[in-house]
């Protein structure tokens, strides 16, 4: 797998954007990721827009990546695509921004989710339309237990029913654990339709408001009660060959300790999990 800046590992270990918080600059994000072992960074549309507002150009961003031998390996996050009413001018602009980012950085897939709870028939139609707008890019649909696509089975139903080859899926440890997914949950999902994996972990007791927990209080892989090792083994044994192994530890308390600490902590935790569960793609 390659991007516009050169060669990549087959499955780059990628630090997700939220793992380093929302306030960090583009140069700092790249530097911290590179210095703490990661192969790539995930970049949200908001991160990209902030970089432009800070005076960087596309060429500047590519140069900064090249200087650190770093890649953007994931682009995110498309939401509010389920109905015509939700697709406001702002939403459409953000969607086009993610398409531009993916092509600029040579990323083949874009992460998306649907928070709105609408009829499944409408989700199927809307997902197909989103895939058509994405053209050659893959749409990675992420199931979330508090969303309109609550579990892996629902995600695969709509991806299959929309009839687009570029409708694929994302599996995240946090959502997997909180949606009570098991090896049985993945049995009917083709392995080649899972485009990426995101590692983290969960507390023993869920918050009353799951989205609040998801966006503020995740744990590093293998350090909680979500059985991250077991999760990774299930995906490996199913035959999944992800384009990206993301590490999405969204934690206010961890970011508050410092970006370097956060990056090194989640890198080491990820390596420990993958050494046990999936040594073929564990960082060396």
Q: Could you say what each language-model-derived stretch is?
A:
Residues 3, 7, 27, 31, ...:
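Active-site acidic/histidine proton-transfer and metal-coordination neighborhood
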Residues 3-24, 76:
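Boundary/entry segment of secreted carbohydrate-active catalytic domains
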Residues 10-14, 40-42, 71-76, 107-111, ...:
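Structural preference for beta-strand elements that scaffold enzyme active sites
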Residues 15, 33, 41, 65, ...:
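Conserved, mostly hydrophobic/aromatic
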Residues 16-20, 44-48, 77-80, 115-117, ...:
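Active-site beta-loop-alpha junctions enriched in small/polar residues
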Residues 30, 52, 86-88, 152-156, ...:
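Gly/Pro-rich active-site loop or hairpin
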Residues 36, 44, 104-105, 192, ...:
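Structural motif
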